[in-house]
């Protein structure tokens, strides 16, 4: 017989299994708690009797399942249940939350739902109340209540992983693309939870760390793209690119800055073609004045390209042409968002906007009192944005994730074709960012 137990983010065993190492301090074989499922499976396959005190689960609450799934959502649930581990990839607006809560309802085990933002805590709480008729526990944003279904931020899960690591058999990671980052990946390894679900619209990461998914949460078990769902479950859509040029003054300034950057890179035998190259430049800039000036030149030239005055004029034309549509204008930074707000007298939402004001703006947009709003990256994740029929992206978004998140904001109503317009500055870094995102 083998005895397994949990201790502060570790599993301890009095017998060896692959993945365990002897600890003189603990007088036991040990491993990070996420190895629990594999270690237990090893002993059972060897027909070794296991006595364990690992999972000390909170009781599962009384719920009332009110979830009706679409065909693809039911397929996703079925795919995950085969191994009770893995990631479900669905576009923004395709109902990942309903899929997850159906799994919670089927599994009927204590569940910890890990989310990146306070706004997502609020969103999940509302959905759990709506679909499961249960008021969940909340950890984060000043609240600290533990229940059989609890929603927690990634940061709080990180700080309390050792304490909570054996309380929840089912672990759900919303926006799971955050998980492979250094601190959060350690957090996931401190939980013994044998059942794990990841949710995202965009699993790939620029740094390649999505390769850690199989270890931390499981492989991708189900995936549907925007294209596969458009028309039947979410709106049909078109993407239109409109090109503008820098003003003469902007072009002169832009060319000077790019020359400064190019000259520096050439003098040091460096390139700036990918993320690794950029990280090398940032590291060098920390100790080298010329590298720092080159990095500033890169940043300033990108700002000129992304926030060109020509884009403001093109936006004016678009707002006039589509004056009967509900429109969200997305900007790369808050400076451009406030500039557009001031120019066109449009309500603006950025990270500086307090929660009450933001909710008021969104509600008025939802009710039709506001027809156009402008937002910076605050809408990327965790904000329940009302339906819009037109999204205008003011450029500067090099990642596919950001682009798909913006597209998802206009795909919720399937009775009308949605349109996304991207305004791109020709012959600049803005153009190259746009091309990279489309590849």
Swiss-Prot record:
Q: Where is the Helicase ATP-binding domain?
A: 77-221
Q: Where is this motif: DEAH box?
A: 174-177
Q: Which reaction does it catalyse?
A: Couples ATP hydrolysis with the unwinding of duplex DNA by translocating in the 3'-5' direction; ATP + H2O = ADP + phosphate + H(+)
Transmembrane stretches, by residue range?
Answer: none
What CDD domains does the database record attribute to this sequence? DEXHc_RE (cd17926), SF2_C_XPB (cd18789)
Q: What ranges does the record give for the region DRD domain, renumbered to this chain?
A: 1-54
Which biological process terms from the Gene Ontology are attached to this UniProt entry?
DNA repair
Q: State its role.
A: ATP-dependent DNA translocase which moves along double-stranded DNA (dsDNA) in a 3'-5' direction, unwinding the DNA. The ThM domain grips the resulting 3'-ssDNA tail and functions as a wedge (particularly Phe-278), breaking dsDNA base pairs, probably using the energy from ATP hydrolysis to move along dsDNA. A DNA-dependent ATPase; double-stranded DNA (dsDNA) stimulates the activity more than single-stranded DNA (ssDNA), while Bax1 stimulates ATPase more. In an in vitro assay had no detectable helicase activity. Binds ssDNA better than dsDNA.
Q: Which family does it belong to?
A: Belongs to the helicase family. RAD25/XPB subfamily.
* Quaternary state and interactors: Forms a heterodimer with Bax1.
> Domain comment, in the record's words?
The C-terminus binds Bax1. The N- and C-terminal domains are joined by a flexible hinge region which allows the two domains to rotate and form either an open conformation or closed formation. The ThM region is involved in interactions with Bax1. In complex with a partially unwound DNA bubble substrate the ThM domain and RED motif contact the ds-ssDNA junction; both are important for binding to bubble DNA substrates. The DRD domain (residues 1-54) structurally resembles the mismatch recognition domain of MutS.
Q: What is this protein called?
A: DNA 3'-5' translocase XPB2
Organism of this sequence: Sulfurisphaera tokodaii (strain DSM 16993 / JCM 10545 / NBRC 100140 / 7) (Sulfolobus tokodaii)
Q: Which gene encodes it?
A: xpb2
